[in-house]
Curated annotation (Swiss-Prot):
Belongs to the universal ribosomal protein uS3 family. This is Small ribosomal subunit protein uS3. Binds the lower part of the 30S subunit head. Binds mRNA in the 70S ribosome, positioning it for translation. It comes from Halorhodospira halophila (strain DSM 244 / SL1). HAMAP family: Ribosomal_uS3_B. The gene is rpsC. One of its GO terms (cellular component) is cytosolic small ribosomal subunit. Keywords: Ribonucleoprotein, Ribosomal protein, RNA-binding, rRNA-binding. Pfam families: KH_2, Ribosomal_S3_C.
Amino acid sequence: MGNKTHPTGFRLGVTEDWRSMWYADSSNFGKYLNTDLEVREFIRERLKNASVSRIQIERPAKNALVTIHTARPGIVIGKKGEDIDRLRGEVAARMGVPVHINIEEIRKPEADSKLVAESIAGQLERRVMFRRALKRAVGNAQRVGAQGIKVQVSGRLNGSEIARTEWYREGRVPLHTLRADIDYGFAEAKTTYGVIGVKVWIFKGEIIDTENEGAPAERVKRAAAAQG
């Protein structure tokens, strides 16, 4: 039987970029990685009402640059920038280096997989029927330009005795195509019956690099010439 690979990890270095971008030797790698995980968890908990999609961390020359992608930048910044200044200080204390925070606004939250998954999870926690929540999310994503979307929920749906998986798809979601821009997100709904997992795949089109088109073929030719 085939197993599904993570859509983002599958495309790293092709159409997706890493969430943490820094270099460290073997003695510091574990410490940096653990710090990144702690900072992400802290920011998500601190800004749980700000619709945060993803957090990118860079470490240039004894500094840190944290980029927060959010649909509600006003909540992150706060009145006269007070909240973001406080957040910067707290993150710097955890990372042990000066921190600069960038805020990137998400213009279309209906087409962001992480925010869509969290929205569905929130509706399930408020006892909305899962089929209604799924169809609403699919319709909203297509309305703002998504070429395809698949949503899946797993668990004790509507309080049933036996856990099951239900999914709904509209349009194309080509998971095997590396050049396909697939946005994948996951969230959990904590209901009185247990945890329900929510997965969302959104296809936004194909990324075609016209400048390097044919480059792999050229590399094969050069390698063959070198061997021959």
